[in-house]
Amino acid sequence: MAGSSFRFRPAALPLQGALLILLLAPASGAAPASAADLSAAVTAATAELRQGWSADPTTAALPFPSVRLLPPDASVQGTCNPKAPARVPAPRAAYCASSGEVLLDRELLEKPYGRAQPSVGRALVTYWIATALAERLLPAAPEGAGSDPLRILQATCRGGVLLGASPARKSFPDATPLLIAARSAYGDRYATAVGSASQRGYALLTGLGATATSSCDAAEMAALVKGAVPDRALLATIEQLPPPDRAYGSLLGAINSQCKPLLPKRPCPRKQ
């Protein structure tokens, strides 16, 4: 958006250099989040995302799925479809079509949530719920289908759109914690099944209106799987970032000013 002002935008630095400098900034000294607060974080994130769901004309007429944090020792797949082949990697959250719920794996979420900085812990929970809600909007996956990078990236992108439409974006005026959550969602060894860390980060930023990719459509995300995006320099910059658990700092001023929200008549999350 021409003329928009963004916080911490370093005018003398090109986009990619600014992004690296800001994201390479050391972590703050805040105390790690407590795993005991996980249930409260799920409740808070769900309430915020529900508002975004109701505000978006593409989802307002659809029932909002219930969100359930599973008890210890219960997995998402074991609860939703125990007869299907095991998904590798196991998701921390997913939409269960048979019950119409978003299911969250308590054990897979507790450890990263408990050891994270508070803002990153909240972003982790919000990211997983948002992407699982976005799965509700995608065509049903074939019975017993394994992980699919295209589907993962579409859900990540549409989850970003949902985040941008909800009060959750005000909880993260700096989008860096959300980018960390997207990049750290799966281990690098699973990249062929779920997309690389940089692809997930780019997909999330696309949903937030911060890339040159214009939509979350299958064709756009298929191009991302191949690395054929309009702004390859940004994708390359995300690839150069340090491991997600060390990527702290301000992201807002580093993303290009051509912010184009994917929801009509809604400001980008990065706009002041």
What positions do the PLM features span?
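Pan-zinc metallopeptidase signature
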Residues: 190-271
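Short helix/loop segments within enzyme catalytic domains
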Residues: 40-64, 150-190
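Bacterial N-terminal signal peptides
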Residues: 14-27
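Catalytic zinc-binding patch centered on the HExxH motif and its immediate surroundings
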Residues: 72-103
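Active-site recognition of the HExxH zinc-binding catalytic motif
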Residues: 104, 127-140, 156
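Boundary at the C-terminal end of the N-terminal hydrophobic targeting segment
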Residues: 29-35
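N-terminal secretory signal peptides that target proteins for export/translocation
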Residues: 1-10
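Short pre-active-site segment immediately N-terminal to the catalytic Zn-binding motif
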Residues: 110-127
